[in-house]
Amino acid sequence: MKKFTDLPYVRPNIEEVKKDFRDQVNLLKNAITFDAQKQAITQINRINAAVDTMSNIASIRNSIDTTDKFYDEERTFFDENGPEISDINFEYYTALANSKFKKDLIAEFGNQLFTIAEYRVNSFSKDIIEDLKEENKLGSTYSKLVASAKIGFDGKELNLSQLAPYAQSSDRKVRKAAAEARYNFVAANADKFDKIYDDAVKLRHQMATKMGFKNFVELGYLKMQRSDYTPEMVANYRKQVLDHIVPLAVKIRKKQADRLGLEKLKHYDLSYFYPSGNPKPKGDAKWIIDNGIKMYRELSDETGEFFDFMTKNELMDLETKKGKDVGGYCTFIANYGAPFIFSNFNGTSGDIDVLTHEAGHAFQVYSSRNQKINEYFWPTYESAEIHSMSMEFFTWPWMGLFFKEDTEKYRYEHLASGLLFLPYGVAVDEFQHAVYEKPEMTPAERKDT
């Protein structure tokens, strides 16, 4: 395989893609043997993989440099044409669900393919194609807005990722100032953020009602492929977190306040765990990767092979820089069987969390790269977190490589942060339910929810 920077990018000819795809769907519909259907499915997967490969290469390069006009235009191209591909996939999944060789296909590919097909059929309609294009456009607008941050702080011009280490400063005044600088950026752009979100909520409600749903909650569950649980079960889970995790979270925060000698934690104290300073990796990005190679080789032959593949082919872009999108993610370049990890290293313990969390996603999809059908490259959205969170803890025995004398400090902070995330995570989930159940709320009313 070539290095990522050398991978060719060619914009797909959407009309040719649609014609080739529909030809295979017609073969699938009209097949008189199981083998003929299986061959059509193989070809459909080939077409989808080719389009996904170009889409992901363009998306990665755009997120690495959001100011690159060429890949900005390519992202816009896929924003506009992705729903057209969803339309022909809808035809494929409908034909699949109605196959007269369904039992044979289940024996060959498993029942999960048909569960996914059912959810994708039920979450799509030709009536919402233009809405989906607009939704994609809103997502891209949001990414550009966040990446545009140029915050004057400590005599430097910083983006949001570069500002983050100051939120863990041992100087409380610096932590407070960093928080204010972050929120000043948000406040200065509040109208833009509010409009993007308000437009998205109303657009999603419109899509849901067009398809016969009461609101976006039902459609959202289908799009997330939540096939094993309902809103009622999720509400019960939130109650369990409230009853069992929140009391523990309160104790963790109380101990944190005591360690810091504070009567009460403020929002700008939450990321600061120790009066002696938070644990940090003891080297730069190259040093972290070199130790990552050692760690994954010692963890298992399989993880060693995987991480060597990632480093050899430069399938990671890790350091924060101007114009780069925020956050971190893992994606998959199907035609090369190659995961890609995107991150924003900033000298905090979060750099190691990314090295393990996103590598958990990447190792999972690398292990699944030879699946017969594209739908099995990834688990469903939330099931995927099993692999990433597991890798964070599988690698605990090697944390000494990165944190040296601060290893136990890191382990405590890491475990405590994992527990503290649970109340936050379910609060976000409950907020989403509230927002989509009452799409008529104004931005101000949402903020008060």
Model-found features: residue ranges?
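A well-structured
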Residues: M1-N278
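Long, well-ordered alpha-helical segments
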Residues: Y197-A208, F213-K214, I252-R253, G360-N370, ...
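Post-HExxH zinc-binding segment in Zn-dependent metallohydrolases
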Residues: D243-H244, S368, P379-E408, H414-A416, ...
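Auxiliary, metal-adjacent structural segments of Zn-dependent hydrolase domains
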Residues: R259, P275-Y336, T348-S349
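Long, K/E/R/D-enriched contiguous segments that form extended
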Residues: K264-N291, Q364, M399, K409-F421, ...
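Short beta-alpha connecting loops at secondary-structure transitions
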Residues: F340-N344, Q371-Y381, Y410-S417, V435-Y436
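Active-site recognition of the HExxH zinc-binding catalytic motif
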Residues: S343-S368, S388, F393, F431
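Long, amphipathic alpha-helical stalk/connector segments used for oligomerization, subunit docking
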Residues: P397-T449
